[in-house]
C-alpha cells in the first residue's frame, strides 16, 4: 500500500524536457495565447450526488486503527480512485489533520464504474497524531478521462452527436466556423470538479495533433487550478484556434511535424481529464 508517491508529489518534479510536447517551457506558459477559457452562468444540478463517499459508521473510538470509506459511483462516468486525507474541526474551522513525514501512497489502478462501490482504507498509522474526541472530515477524489468527437470541414466544425456526453457532466463541441474549436464542459453535480489540464486534441490514430492544446506541464495544472475549478452547477467553455504560429515551435522535428500550421479537415477526438472531489464527516467519542 505504501509504495509509491502521491500524484501531487510527482508533478513538481516534472521537467519541460520530460514532456512529449512541441513547445518550449516559455511558450507552454503563455497560457492565454494558447487557449481561451470562459466561465459560464450556472447550469441545472440534475445529478447532485453522482459520486458519494461515506464512513461505515458515524462514530469512532479514539483507539480506532482504521476507518473504511465506501466510494460510490451513483451516476457518473467511470473514474479511477485516487487518495484520501482528513481534516479536523478547530475553533469552528476545518484544518488539515497531518500525515506523518515522508509518507507515500500507492494510488491508481482501481476503476469505479457506474453503480459500483469500492472501499478505501484510512489507517491511523498514516497520521502524526492519534484521534481525539472531535469532529472530523474525510476527503477523497476520483480521476476521470472523458472525451467527445467533432468533424472539421473547410467551412465549419460540427460535433459528432452520438459521442457527446450528458448526464452528470455534459461534454461536447459546439457548432462553429472552422477557425476555432469551442469545447463546452458542464458540471451538473453538486461536487467540485477540477479540469486538470487544457483539453487534448488527437485522432484515433495519433495523440496530440495540436501543439497548443494539453501539455501535461505542472504549471498548466496550477494555472487551471487558479482559473478553472468548478463548483456544483458551473460550466466552462474552452476555445482553441485551429491554426498556430509554426515559428513558436523551436525543435526542428516538431516544426516539421506541425508545419501545416493548422488542423486539416477530418475527425478529431477531444479529451479532458477531471478530478472530482468528495467529503463526509464523522465523530470521535
Residue ranges of predicted features:
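Bacterial Sec-dependent N-terminal signal peptides
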Residues: 1-18
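Short, low-complexity intrinsically disordered segments
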Residues: 1-4, 92, 215, 242
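Primarily secretory-pathway and cell-envelope proteins
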Residues: 18-100, 141-232, 257-259, 272-285
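A generic structural signal for short beta-strands and their flanking turns/coil linkers
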Residues: 67, 82-84, 118, 134, ...
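Short, solvent-exposed, Trp/other aromatic-anchored flexible loops in extracytoplasmic proteins
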Residues: 100-133, 145, 217-265
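A short tyrosine-centered beta-strand micro-motif
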Residues: 132-141, 263-273
